[in-house]
Amino acid sequence: RPTWFPTGSFRWPCYGVITSFFGPRRASVPGASTYHEALDIANSYGTAIYAADGGTVTLAGWYGGLGYCVKINHGNGFVTTYGHNSSLLVSVGQHVYKGQQIARMGSTGISSGPHCHFGVTRNGTIVDPLNYLP
């Protein structure tokens, strides 16, 4: 039975192709940062976005350049961010379990096409998501 408590390990937030890695990059669209603080995973509009681990939704709405965004506090020092969604399936305060669908992929905010901007923060520091994915 799924639980919203963190398992201590992450799953991939969606299926797709990595189009931008964490770290320095050339801005893909005007206004985009040249230091990328996340992993971009591209697929088609509407592709399911899943919670990387159990936790509590702390943001579900418009978040500037990330467009429609979800943030989940996993309660163990980790916060994950899922940006550029076309629609959101969760609300602030909601408990979610690892693998629960939380959004649908889109291209909202500053974006060049449909993808999931997947960010990981550990104890307040932005870190490379690839270091925490299987």
Task: Identify the residue ranges that each predicted region occupies.
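Catalytic cores of peptidoglycan-degrading enzymes
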Residues: 8-134
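Alpha-helical oligomerization segments with coiled-coil/rod-like character
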Residues: 1-5
